[in-house]
């Protein structure tokens, strides 16, 4: 059972990971902007967000930055760590396992072919404690466009119905 302090810390650190991801929104295409915060004994030892252009991934930066302090730590990740990579490089789930992270808290499961539950499954099989869905509503808003594109194959387009912001003319 999670203690009230642990639950409060989880929310705080996931909130930080979401803030890191938000700061990179629109810069990481074709990948989603992901935030990762590595915490050991209540102290942030490393944090990162997906780099512009989509590489390297957040975990791929944060885990090496944490170094030996990643062993036994908790990683707060806004989206499920990838379970495979199109480039053949090490997956983010492997980075977390190899570093000795003890627990991974994930806001949103990634429906893409490179994750789709495989990242979480790989972490669990390796003996890591994994929790999903923390701040899921905030993550759903953050990843609305990405999730739409993965699920439909089309970009999400919103047209404002704000008459003041729309400045176009249509002819018959």
Residue ranges and their predicted role:
Residues 6-29:
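Short, basic/aromatic recognition patches
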Residues 19-26, 68, 128, 144, ...:
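Generic secondary-structure signature for well-ordered alpha-helical cores
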Residues 28-42:
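N-terminal glycine-rich anion-binding loops that anchor highly charged ligand groups
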Residues 144-149, 156-172:
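Active-site ligand-binding patch in enzyme domains
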């Amino acid at each position: 059972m999670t203690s009230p302090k642990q639950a409060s810390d989880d929310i705080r650190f996931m909130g930080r990971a979401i803030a890191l991801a938000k700061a990179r929104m629109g810069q990481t295409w074709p990948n989603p902007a992901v935030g990762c915060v590595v915490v050991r004994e209540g102290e942030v030892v490393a944090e990162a967000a997906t780099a512009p252009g989509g590489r390297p991934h957040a975990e791929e930066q944060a885990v090496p930055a944490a170094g030996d302090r990643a062993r036994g730590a908790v990683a707060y990740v806004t989206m499920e760590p990838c379970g495979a990579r199109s480039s053949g490089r090490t997956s983010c789930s492997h980075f977390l396992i190899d570093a000795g992270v003890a627990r991974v808290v994930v806001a949103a499961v990634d429906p893409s072919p490179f994750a789709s539950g495989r990242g979480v499954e790989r972490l669990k099989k390796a003996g890591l404690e994994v929790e999903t869905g923390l701040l899921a509503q905030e993550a759903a808003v953050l990843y609305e466009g990405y999730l739409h594109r993965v699920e439909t194959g089309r970009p999400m387009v919103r047209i404002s119905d704000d008459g003041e912001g729309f400045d176009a003319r249509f002819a018959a």
